[in-house]
Amino acid sequence: MDDTSAHEKYPLLDLCAPVTPPRRRPKPRWARPKDRSKNDSDSRHSTGSSSSDSTPKPPPRKPLNEQVNHWTLQGPATVTLHVHTPSGTQVTLTVHL
């Protein structure tokens, strides 16, 4: 079976679109940490970092979304994805539904 029939059969399956996770609701007041304990840990942390005189490093960036360049539908319940990451890694993923 060729690629075009699979894309026509599943038009909403856009695997190249970036995926954004759903937004989380804020924690209720009883689930938040107490301000007093938070301030204590912050003051201890700031003293340790001031002695080293180093600027805090930003957290590492999340990798970019992988791009699916080619996918095929094999039979009624098997999909094969050919994934190419921006770093050059190539992965073939076969999913049996």
From Swiss-Prot:
Protein name per UniProt: Protein E4
Modification note: Phosphorylated by host ERK. The phosphorylation triggers a structural change that enhances keratin binding and protein stability.
InterPro entries xrefs: Papilloma_E4
Remaining remarks: The major E4 form is first synthesized as an E1^E4 fusion protein from spliced E1^E4 transcripts, such that the first few amino acids of the E4 protein are derived from the N terminus of E1.
GO biological process annotation, one example: symbiont-mediated arrest of host cell cycle during G2/M transition
Primary location group: host cell
Organism: Human papillomavirus 28
Assembly description: Assembles into oligomeric complexes. Interacts with host CDK1. Interacts with host SRPK1; this interaction may favor expression of late viral transcripts. Interacts with host cytokeratin components KRT8 and KRT18.
Gene: E4
Location in the cell: Host cytoplasm; Host nucleus
Disordered as annotated region, ranges: 1-70
